[in-house]
């Protein structure tokens, strides 16, 4: 969600892109919409049910944006996210995958966990380490693109192997 800090809960540009490409180019859901789904949407059994849930998520996401700061929303999202292996939330995931706390994660570890948020099963570092490493590197490239890290850091960290301290 590259525009997380600039949208109001629903990113219509991303939503329009997802509709045009039938969801193949990436989802149109913002972090806030995903949080709304995690907290309030029951599991949909089919595409029609899922389509009917979307407008409700938009309303909830807009309300969340009015009630909470962006940082609070991001924290709620990361504390609700299921990183697999009974690791719900960033604190638990940091322990399960790296035997550390979130504040002590290395950049490559944090990028891997963020990468899992796109699809935890697909980018499961235990079962699919190469996929997880590639996704981590995509996150690092995005961090460089948006100015969070420089090119040298991106290149050096991307070259590192995926190193888990899985418990």
Q: For the regions a protein language model found, what residue spans apply to each?
A:
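Peptidoglycan glycan-strand catalytic modules in the bacterial/periplasmic cell-wall system
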Residues: 1-150
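Non-catalytic structural connector segments
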Residues: 150-167
């Amino acid at each position: 969600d590259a525009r997380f800090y600039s949208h109001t809960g629903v990113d219509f540009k991303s939503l329009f892109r997802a509709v045009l490409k039938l969801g193949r180019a990436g989802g149109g859901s913002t972090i806030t919409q995903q949080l709304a789904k995690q907290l309030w949407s029951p599991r949909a059994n089919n595409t029609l049910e899922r389509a009917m849930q979307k407008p409700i998520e938009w309303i909830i996401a807009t309300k969340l944006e009015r009630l909470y700061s962006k940082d609070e929303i991001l924290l709620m999202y990361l504390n609700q996210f299921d990183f697999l292996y009974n690791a719900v939330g960033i604190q638990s995931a940091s322990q399960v995958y790296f035997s550390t706390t979130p504040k002590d994660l290395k950049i490559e570890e944090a990028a891997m966990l963020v990468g899992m948020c796109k699809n935890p099963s697909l980018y499961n570092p235990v079962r699919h380490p190469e996929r997880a490493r590639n996704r981590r590197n995509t996150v690092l490239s995005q961090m460089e693109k948006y100015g969070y890290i420089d090119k040298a850091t991106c290149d050096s960290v991307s070259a590192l192997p995926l190193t888990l301290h899985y418990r």
